[in-house]
Regions:
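Short, Lys/Arg-enriched N-terminal segments with co-localized hydrophobic residues
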Residues: 9-20
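Catalytic-core "active-site belt" of small-molecule-metabolizing enzymes
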Residues: 20-64
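Conserved short histidine dyad/triad with adjacent acidic residue
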Residues: 41-46, 59-77, 112-115
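Short beta-strand segments in beta-sandwich/barrel cores
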Residues: 61, 71-72, 89-93, 107
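Short, conserved beta-strand element in jelly-roll/cupin
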Residues: 65-68, 76-92, 134
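Short acidic-glycine-tyrosine-enriched beta hairpin
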Residues: 96-112
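A short hydrophobic beta-strand segment most commonly corresponding to one strand
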Residues: 109-113, 119, 123-136
C-alpha cells in the first residue's frame, strides 16, 4: 500500500502502457514552473478477484462540463484536486512546452498552486465532463 506522503511526493513513477488509465500529477517545482509526473498507486490483492490501493482522503465532488474547443490560458489549480475525466479530452500544457492529453478514465492530481501554472485546451467535438474531488 502507498503511504499518503509518498503519493504526495510522487515516489512511484511509471511508464503508461497502451490502453492503460493515466494518473498524472501536476505540481509546482522549485523553478516556479509546473511539471508533470506519471504515478501509479500500488494495488494490493483483496482476495475477491480485485485489487485496492490505500484510501486517498477527499471531501465532496464538483462536476464540471467544458465546451468543445474551450481554452483557458495560464492559470493555477484553485486548490489540490483529483480530477477524473469522464468524457471528452483536454490538452494540458506546462511551462517547458510539454503537453499531455487526458481522456475518459484518466486522472489528474492538480497541485500547481503557485508559479506559472498551466494552460488547458479542450479537444475533440464533444464537451469534456470531469469530476473534481478536493484533496486535503
Amino acid at each position: 500500500m502507498i503511504a499518503l506522503d509518498e503519493f504526495r511526493q510522487g515516489l512511484y513513477p511509471w511508464g503508461p502502457e497502451e490502453g492503460h488509465m493515466a494518473i498524472i500529477r501536476i505540481y509546482t517545482g522549485p523553478d516556479g514552473k509546473s511539471h508533470f509526473q506519471d504515478i501509479e498507486p500500488k494495488l494490493e490483492p483483496r482476495g475477491d478477484q480485485s485489487e485496492v490501493a490505500e484510501l486517498i482522503p477527499g471531501s465532496g465532488i464538483v462536476i464540471r462540463r467544458f465546451e468543445p474547443k474551450r481554452t483557458n490560458p495560464w492559470h493555477h489549480a484553485p486548490g489540490r484536486y483529483a480530477v477524473f475525466t469522464l468524457s471528452g479530452a483536454v490538452d494540458i500544457e506546462i511551462g517547458d512546452g510539454t503537453v499531455r492529453r487526458l481522456g475518459p478514465g484518466d486522472i489528474l492530481i492538480a497541485e500547481d498552486l503557485t508559479g506559472q501554472g498551466h494552460a488547458t485546451r479542450e479537444v475533440g467535438p464533444e464537451p469534456r465532463v470531469s469530476v473534481f474531488v478536493p484533496l486535503p
